A protein has these predicted regions:
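Metabolite-binding pocket within alpha/beta catalytic cores that recognizes anionic/polar moieties
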Residues: 1-124
Length: 124
C-alpha cells in the first residue's frame, strides 16, 4: 500500500535507507550510486533509489525534526525497510572537534515530544 507521506510502497523492494534532512543531500547521496531512479518528492520527502556495492539503497530526505523523521521511519518500516541510517550536520561545543570531522552520536539531549513515544525517559 502506498504510504500517505512518503508516497512509496512495497514494490520498491528496498531494505536499506540513508536519511538526510535536506532534499539536496539525498541527491548528493544518490550521486554515489549506480542505476539511480528518481522516485520524486512529496512534502519534505525527496526519494531516490540506486545500487551501491551490490545493495539496493534508498536515499530519502526527512526534513528537520523528530516528527517528520518519525513519520518517515514508520512509513519506511511499513514498506519493508529494515535498516536506516540518519545522517546530517550539527554544531559542536568542544574546541577539539574540527569542522567536517565525522561524529557518531551515542546519545542526545532529548527535549521533544516525538522521542518519548519511542524510548523511555532517561535513555541517551
Amino acid at each position: 500500500m502506498k504510504q500517505p507521506h512518503i508516497q512509496l510502497d512495497e514494490s520498491l523492494n528496498v531494505r536499506y535507507a540513508i536519511l538526510p534532512g535536506d532534499p539536496k543531500r539525498a541527491e548528493r547521496i544518490a550521486s554515489h550510486m549506480s542505476e539511480v531512479e528518481d522516485l520524486g518528492m512529496n512534502r519534505e520527502y525527496r526519494s531516490l533509489v540506486g545500487a551501491y556495492r551490490g545493495a539496493r539503497i534508498l536515499a530519502m530526505s526527512t526534513g528537520m525534526g523528530g516528527v517528520s523523521t518519525g513519520i518517515a521511519v514508520e512509513e519506511l518500516h511499513n514498506i519493508g525497510v529494515t535498516h536506516a541510517i540518519r545522517i546530517g550536520s550539527c554544531g559542536a561545543l568542544q574546541t577539539d572537534i574540527a569542522p567536517g570531522e565525522l561524529l557518531i552520536a551515542a546519545g542526545a539531549v532529548r527535549d521533544d515530544g516525538t522521542s518519548r513515544a519511542y524510548v523511555r525517559e532517561g535513555y541517551p
